[in-house]
């Protein structure tokens, strides 16, 4: 086992403890892992000594005869039994140690802000022209302090996306969906459905033009696999499990794509491998409590296009920058104003060494909301899934690095369009970049989405 965290455990456990402190996690986990690894190495020495003794004994037996031969054969059998018991003990300790190591989060990158929660996240970039209601200017300036941002003041108060969707456009119904399925479900109709499809087509069109292979992945994964992709103990309240089946619904195509090379080796000269996955995403949102109960911002199901890269360790930071650049290009083409946030250590999640969020300005809410999450997971997932690269020229093996980023999460992006592209009369302009994906369908909206006079249901 050659994961970097084991090397840290042996050479610099204090640095590993500091990593856990940065994440606001109990450092005693490191002490337990150190003790298990120490015990493992002690038992390994005993196993190797016993193997050597058994090999020496086995080599002597063919040269012997009579009672001495019988005596040595019996001695060999007894020694083999002791060896087998020690090997079982070694395996048991190794499993326990590796289970504990697998529960530890990734090593935080040096340039990640320190802090226990999202209040320590640091905005590092702003893009676009922000529409700000005159009553929200002070709050907007507070959220963009020390940044040179371009904004326009509007005198009318934009309506929230939930009100636009259900009460103005009459193109959605969450109340009926809640009646038959529970909260955080929805019915969407006509132009909003077309908008959903257009966003997905635009995202996969753009990302595949950047050299990514399009993937339609499995929507479910076995328990062993999903546990390797994410920290399932932490996220068990976020992932749906199929009753009486060892299957879990994916929360993003990242999960299935990450597992594409489960327990396999990849030739180093084939890296990087870049994929664009399109799939539904299923999320319990159990930890969301009473957040975003109205509308379609935080829901149990939505469509998503995901970027994913398998990389060599030396190139992974380059590809992390590429992923967020791709995401920025998508939202720039949509002309949705946003900021990029460097996520604090305590808000990262176990998988990521570093994460950027892209947050779009929502003028009705007077706040920035997350649309994209872009992570470098280094070798955390690869270690757990046993995905290695093979460098045959240098006779070397190592764990690949895995990286992921949202391209489009459809419902969230629709909320951003409804708030940023609405007019005072309730009409919503269709972003120009999406229009070519709609023009081929006679019933799809072309330039504008107009309010219906009556509700569909």
UniProtKB/Swiss-Prot annotation:
Entry GO terms, CC: cytoplasm
InterPro entries xrefs: aa-tRNA-synt_IIb (IPR002314), aa-tRNA-synth_II (IPR006195), aa-tRNA-synth_II/BPL/LPL (IPR045864), Ser-tRNA-ligase_type_1 (IPR002317), Ser-tRNA-synth_1_N (IPR015866), SerRS_1_N_sf (IPR042103), SerRS_core (IPR033729), tRNA-bd_arm (IPR010978)
Keyword presence, Secreted: no
Gene3D superfamilies: Bira Bifunctional Protein, Domain 2, Serine-tRNA synthetase, tRNA binding domain
UniProt cross-references to Pfam families, sorted A to Z: Seryl_tRNA_N, tRNA-synt_2b
Keywords: Aminoacyl-tRNA synthetase, ATP-binding, Cytoplasm, Ligase, Nucleotide-binding, Protein biosynthesis
Family: Belongs to the class-II aminoacyl-tRNA synthetase family. Type-1 seryl-tRNA synthetase subfamily.
Name of the protein in question: Serine--tRNA ligase
Species whose genome carries this gene: Saccharolobus islandicus (strain L.S.2.15 / Lassen #1)
Species lineage: Archaea, Thermoproteota, Thermoprotei, Sulfolobales, Sulfolobaceae
């Amino acid at each position: 086992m050659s994961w970097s965290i084991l090397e840290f455990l042996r050479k610099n456990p204090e640095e590993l403890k500091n990593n856990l402190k940065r994440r606001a996690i109990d450092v005693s986990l490191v002490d337990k892992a150190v003790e298990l690894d120490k015990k493992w190495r002690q038992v390994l020495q005993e196993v190797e000594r016993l193997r050597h003794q058994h090999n020496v004994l086995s080599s002597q037996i063919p040269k012997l005869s009579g009672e001495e031969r019988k005596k040595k054969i019996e001695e060999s059998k007894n020694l083999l039994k002791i060896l087998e018991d020690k090997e079982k003990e070694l395996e048991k300790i190794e499993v326990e140690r590796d289970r504990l190591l697998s529960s530890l989060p990734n090593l935080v990158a040096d340039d990640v802000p320190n802090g226990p929660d999202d209040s320590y996240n640091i905005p590092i970039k702003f893009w676009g022209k922000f529409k700000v209601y005159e009553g929200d200017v002070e709050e907007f300036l507070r959220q963009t302090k020390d940044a040179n941002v371009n904004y326009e003041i509007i005198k009318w108060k934009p309506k929230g996306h939930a009100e636009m969707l259900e009460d103005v456009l009459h193109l959605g119904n969450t109340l009926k969906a809640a009646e038959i399925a529970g909260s955080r479900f929805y019915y969407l109709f006509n132009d909003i459905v077309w908008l959903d499809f257009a966003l997905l087509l635009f995202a996969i069109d753009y990302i595949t033009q950047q050299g990514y292979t399009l993937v339609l992945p499995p929507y479910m994964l076995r328990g062993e696999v999903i546990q390797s992709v994410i920290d399932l103990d932490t996220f068990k309240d976020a992932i749906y499990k199929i009753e009486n089946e060892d299957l879990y619904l994916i929360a993003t195509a990242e999960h299935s794509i990450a597992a594409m090379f489960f327990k396999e080796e990849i030739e180093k000269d084939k890296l990087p491998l870049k994929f664009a996955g399109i799939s539904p995403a299923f999320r319990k949102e159990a930890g969301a409590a009473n957040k975003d109960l109205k509308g379609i911002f935080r829901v149990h199901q939505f469509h998503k296009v995901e970027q994913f890269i398998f990389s060599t360790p030396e190139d992974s930071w380059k590809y992390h920058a590429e992923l967020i650049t791709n995401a920025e290009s998508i939202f720039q083409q949509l002309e949705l104003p946003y900021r990029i946030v460097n996520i604090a250590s305590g808000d990262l999640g176990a998988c990521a060494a570093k994460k950027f969020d892209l947050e779009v300005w929502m003028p009705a809410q007077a706040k920035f909301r997350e649309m994209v999450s872009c992570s470098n997971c280094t070798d955390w997932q690869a270690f757990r899934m046993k995905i290695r690269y093979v460098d045959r020229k240098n006779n070397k093996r190592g764990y690949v690095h895995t990286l992921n980023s949202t391209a489009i999460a459809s419902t969230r992006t629709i909320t951003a369009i409804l708030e940023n592209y609405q007019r005072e009369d309730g009409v919503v302009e269709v972003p120009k970049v999406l229009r070519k994906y709609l023009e081929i369908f006679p019933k799809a909206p072309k330039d504008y989405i107009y309010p219906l006079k009556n509700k569909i249901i």
